[in-house]
Design a protein with these regions (language model features):
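Hydrophobic transmembrane alpha-helices and their helix-loop junctions in integral membrane proteins
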Residues: 1-196
Length: 196
């Protein structure tokens, strides 16, 4: 039931973000219109924060991670491999899509990147701390996924902050590192769950 609740809370936050963008983009749901609209900094920030926590619930960031260690032990290993290897990466994609693409005309703000890095750091440190206390292999791997999502978010946040400060080289390097680790985690975590 916890996954059901968190998934629906995430859905409501994502919908609120997209409905806000639609409202300020002339009533259009087209991504091209979102990209072309220069939202005010306040509206862009509201849209990003809603999307971040909505997609963060899908990705399993702390404090929205509670469903991961409960769902993985209940699911068959092949389903856990798919969930951790693929499904939670959709949350990362959503954060990147909204923050770096759909709100691009409004410009990325430094504090967005800092917020993403703070939640990434919290998720990575607490994820590994919880994993060290686990004796159930699937729960351990679930907390390990929380940690790795945190590491990925550190790169995403660093990229956003650097982009806002016009440090293009650092922004590209941080984003490449985040995307590389996203792919890396998708490959090895699926294998670990299949072996669990």
């Amino acid at each position: 039931w916890l996954y059901f609740v968190i998934a629906h809370v995430g859905f409501v936050l994502i919908m609120a973000s997209f409905l806000t963008m639609t409202n300020f983009a002339g009533g259009s749901f087209a991504f091209a219109d979102f990209r072309a609209t220069q939202f005010s900094p306040a509206v862009a920030s509201v849209c990003f924060v809603l999307a971040f926590f909505g997609f963060g619930a899908k990705a399993g960031i702390i404090p929205l991670h509670g469903w991961l260690p409960k769902a993985h032990p209940e699911a068959p290993s092949n389903v856990s491999a798919l969930m951790s290897g693929g499904m939670i990466k959709i949350g990362i994609f959503g954060i990147l899509k909204v923050g770096l693409d759909l709100l691009s005309a409004s410009g990325v703000q430094v504090w967005w990147g800092l917020m993403v890095m703070v939640f990434g750091a919290i998720s990575s440190v607490l994820g590994v701390a919880f994993a060290l206390q686990e004796h159930d292999i699937k729960r351990l791997l679930a907390y390990h996924s929380v940690e790795n999502i945190g590491i990925i978010l550190l790169g995403v946040g660093a990229s956003m902050a650097a982009m806002a400060l016009n440090s293009v080289g650092i922004a590209v390097l941080a984003l490449m590192a985040a995307l590389y680790h996203t792919f890396n985690h998708a490959m090895f975590k699926g294998e670990l769950f299949l072996g669990a």
